[in-house]
Regions:
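Central regulatory/effector-binding core of bacterial HTH transcription factors
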Residues: 1-3, 71, 153-157
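Flexible hinge/capping segments at coil-to-helix
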Residues: 3-41
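Short beta-strand->loop
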Residues: 6-16, 101-114
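Generic preference for hydrophobic
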Residues: 17-18, 41, 106, 120, ...
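Thr-Gly-centered strand-to-loop micro-motif
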Residues: 20, 44-45, 67, 90
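Secondary-structure junction motif
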Residues: 25-26, 40-61, 128-130, 136, ...
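Hydrophobic hinge/microswitch elements
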Residues: 50-107
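C-terminal effector-binding regulatory domain of bacterial HTH transcription factors
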Residues: 92-101, 111-157
């Protein structure tokens, strides 16, 4: 990163491959990405960084990412998986409750998905505005200062 820009890692996370109940048998197997391509895939749209990430991940294994269904937001993926429309990569935190309820199944991969990060890039020559500071604090696990609070709504599923 070139000065005066600075990058702060706000959060790291892992994504896992999941499928609906009809894919339960796959939950006891370890699949290669080539085998995953034999099943319908659900993915975020081509204009997203997530799509680019998985496109590169597949290319590193000499494969092309060819999802059957593309969606606009991550929260649209889980209902499609639950309704048996295909396999998908989801952040562990989003998938864990549905896995615990046996609504979906986690599918192991021979080559695990690399860890991802949520980063904030900012210009060190300019101070962060109040909403940006508050969002940064929330993501880093801090709290919003009451006297300086702003209207930030964070929705968790």
């Amino acid at each position: 990163m070139k000065p005066p820009l600075k990058k702060i890692v706000l959060q790291s996370f892992r994504e896992i491959l999941v499928g609906g109940k009809t894919f339960t048998a796959l939950g006891s197997q370890v699949l290669s990405l080539a085998e995953v391509k034999n099943y319908p895939m659900i993915c975020l749209g081509r204009e997203t960084m997530t799509y680019q990430f998985y496109s590169q991940f597949f290319l590193k294994h000499c494969l092309e990412l060819t999802p059957d269904t593309e969606v606009a937001t991550t929260d649209q993926i889980l209902p499609l998986v639950k309704n048996e429309l295909g396999l998908a990569f989801l952040p562990e935190k989003i998938a864990e409750e549905a896995i615990a309820r046996h609504e979906i199944v986690q599918i192991a991969l021979q080559d695990p998905v690399p860890e991802r990060q949520i980063c904030m890039v900012y210009d060190v020559e300019h101070s962060l505005n109040a909403p940006t500071r508050q969002l940064k604090n929330l993501i880093l696990g801090g709290s919003v200062e009451p006297e300086k609070s702003v209207d930030i709504r964070v929705y968790k599923k």
